[in-house]
Amino acid sequence: MEVTAHYIGGKPFVGDTGESFATLNPATGEVLAHIEQADERVLGHAIESAKLGFSVWSSMSAAERSRCLLKAAQLIRDHNDELAELEVRDTGKPIQEASVVDIATGADVIEYFAGLVNGLGGEQQSLGSNQFFYTRREPLGICAGIGAWNYPIQIAMWKAAPALAAGNAMIFKPSEETPLSALKLAELFTQAGVPDGVFNVVQGDYRVGQMLTAHPEIDKVSFTGESGTGKKVMADSAATLKPVTMELGGKSPLIIFDDADLDDAVSAAMVANFYTQGEVCTHGTRVYVQRAMYDAFVEQLKERTEKLIVGDPMNMETQIGSLISKSHLEKVLGAISSAKESGATLLTGGFQVTERGLEKGCFVAPTVFVDCRDEMPHVQNEIFGPVMSVLVFDDEDEVIARANNTQYGLAAGVFTQNLSKAHRVIHQLQAGICWINTWGNSPAEMPVGGYKLSGIGRENGQETLLHYTQTKSVFVELGAFDSPYA
C-alpha cells in the first residue's frame, strides 16, 4: 500500500523519513492507509513553507483573505458527502452524524471568521493638539494546531479559521488515529486560493507534537485533547513563552430538576452521553436527577436507550458507531468493570457488541449505571465512551456543590421550567460552556472552552480572533521633540 504523507507548500509532500504507521477503520479493522511519520527535517520544511506563506498572506487585505476563506467554506460544503464518508471510515462515528454536523459546523466557523475579520481593527486616541496614538491588531506568525481524533476535520477547521482569518499561517498535526481528512482540507484551501504554505499538515504521533510545541519559530499553539497531555503542551510552550489555547477533558454535570419536561430531559441525557458513541469531551456524563423525578426518568431512559441502533457506521440507520481503537475499547470496558465493582447498578448495556458482523470492530452497547455515588471512579474520571452515570439529589444547594466537586470545568447543563432557577444555578456552576433546557449546541458565534483542568482560552466567538493577534501601539508626535537634554 502506498504511503500517504504530509501537505506542505500547497501540495502533498513525502519526506522519506523511513518510518510510517497504519491508520485503521475502527469499525472493521481495515487498513485505510500507511502514513509517514514526520521528523525534524519534515517539520523544518513545513516551517520554511509557512514563513513564505505568511509573508504573502499577512500582506493581503482582510477583504482578500475573507474572499479566499469564503470560497474554501463553499468548497468544503460542496464536498460534504466525500468528507463525511472519509471521516466515518477514519473515526467509526455514524454517517448520520458526520454528514450533517462535522463538516457543516466546520464550514460555519470558517464563514464566521471570514466575515468577522473585516472588522478587526485597532483604536486611535488624541493626546492633545500635537500627539496621538493608535493600535494595530497584527497576526502572530506561524501557529501550530494539534487536533484530536473524535472530530478530526471539525477541529482542524475550528483552529484554522481564526488563525488564517487574522493573517497567520498554520501547521496542523492531526491525531495519528485520524490523519486523513486534514489532508483533504488542506487541498481545498489551496483550491480556494489560499497561498501555498499558509495551511500545512504534518503527520505523526506525540513526537511531532513535542517538536511543534518546543520549536522557537512556532508563535502559538492550539491544542485539543486530554488534560494530562495539555499540561505537557503548556510546559513545552513555556520554554519559548508562546501563548496556548487548550480545549481539554471534562466530566460534566447535567442537572435535571423535578419540574423539567421528562421527555426532553431524557433526550438530552442520551445525546449528552451517547452521541459519537460517547467520545465527546463536553458530554454530560454525570446526570443528576431530582428525587421526585428519578424513578420516571430511569424507567424511560432504560426503555429508550435499549432501542438505540448499534451498527455499521456507514448505515444511515446506525445511531451508535465504533469506538476509535481496540486500546480505547479496552479502556472503556475497564471503566464499566470498575463501575460494577464499586457498587453501581447496571441498568442497561455494559458489554461489547459483536453480533451482526461487528466482531472486528470496537462497539460498546450504550451503558447506564444507576445508584451511583460521587466518589465512585467512573463518576469522577473521564471515560470517553457511551457510559452514563445517574445520581439522585434532593435540593438545589446540594446539587450545585456536588456538580462543582470535580477537577474539570468544561460544560454543564440544567433542565427546569423555572428560568429564574435555571439562571441562578448556571451562574454558580464552574464550567465554561453551559446549556439551559438543551445540550451540545455550539454555534460559531459562541465562545467555547473550559474552567479548571478543562482548558485555557476559547475557540469560536469574537474573542477567539484576539487570541490569534497581538497589539502594536504606535505613538505619534506632530510637533517638535521635547528633549530633556540641552
Curated annotation (Swiss-Prot):
> What cystine pairs are annotated?
none
Q: Which cofactor does it need?
A: K(+)
The record describes how the cofactor is bound as: Binds 2 potassium ions per subunit.
InterPro entries per the record?
Ald_DH/histidinol_DH, Ald_DH_C, Ald_DH_CS_GLU, Ald_DH_N, Aldehyde_DH_dom, BADH
Query: Which Enzyme Commission number(s) are on file for it?
Result: 1.2.1.8
Pathway membership: Amine and polyamine biosynthesis; betaine biosynthesis via choline pathway; betaine from betaine aldehyde: step 1/1
Kindly state which reaction or reactions the protein catalyses. Answer: betaine aldehyde + NAD(+) + H2O = glycine betaine + NADH + 2 H(+)
Q: Which residues bind NAD(+)?
A: G147, A148, W149, K173, P174, S175, E176, E226, S227, G228, T229, G249, C281, E382
In which family does this protein belong, per the annotation?
A: Belongs to the aldehyde dehydrogenase family.
Summary of subunit composition and partner proteins: Dimer of dimers.
UniProt protein name: Betaine aldehyde dehydrogenase
Give the species this sequence originates from: Vibrio vulnificus (strain CMCP6)
Gene assigned in the entry = betB
